[in-house]
Amino acid sequence: AQMHETEQNLDSAPVDAAYIPAKKGAVWGGEWKYCWFQTEYTVPEEYANIPLFLKADVGGQESMLFIDGVPSGIFTIPQNGAAHGYHYCDLITMGTAANTHYHFDLEAYAWHYTPGSQPMVTNPMPDFLHHYNSIEVCVKNPVINQFYFDLKTFDQMTEVLDANSFVRAEIIKTLMRVHEIVYYSPDDTDKETFLAAIKEAQKELTKLYQYKNTSLAPVAKLVGHSHMDTAWHWPIDQTIKKCARTFSNQLKLMEEYPEYRFIQSSSYHSYMMKVHYPSLYKGMKKAI
């Protein structure tokens, strides 16, 4: 990867900029500063026709991913996880042919000082310095992914279901069987044996889906939405970028999860995208 620092507020990657090699541990930043990273990737045969993701550890408060010049996702630092989501891995494609070539640009923002929004609180002044570590293309292991979320869901259900619930009792029995099947660390055995145990435990978890609520139970349906503040702790130009990061991320989520729906409730914010990020605006219109 290569990197280039700038104070310019740009809508696309700088052309003919003085990029330098991005070395692990490289320091960049300062208040109101941006750092652009760029790299290339060609899909090998072994990764053809499967979902591919980009994992970027470049520092910065928030970053926007461009794939072949089109805004395509957001990255945020772990410290923002509770309030803004910890976006550390973005979808590149749900599957493409071998030898497909991609150009990636990342616009990372160091951030700026905000004195606080509460009358008795004054935020300290940070140095706004960040470190580059890596940009990697990765794949998702579907076996572990499915097992992790099923296990987490049923474990959480034991905490909220009535203590006398027969369903809760069956979940606990199943979790005990899972405990007896899986290896608690990949280091305890070889990869094939570890994954085989996960698959066997998944069969036990899948059985729990046969238990349904009664016809009187309510149905909960979810829809995505993002509260976009206009010029709150930042000037208008940062609102534009926040919208671009957020909306491009929603389009990628829709690509990964076709059933997902997102409500964009501000025509002004859509207008911002039309003016500053027309390729993103085109994708937004297509998704309606």
Question: Residue spans of the language-model regions?
Answer:
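Carbohydrate-active enzymes and regulators
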Residues: A1-I288
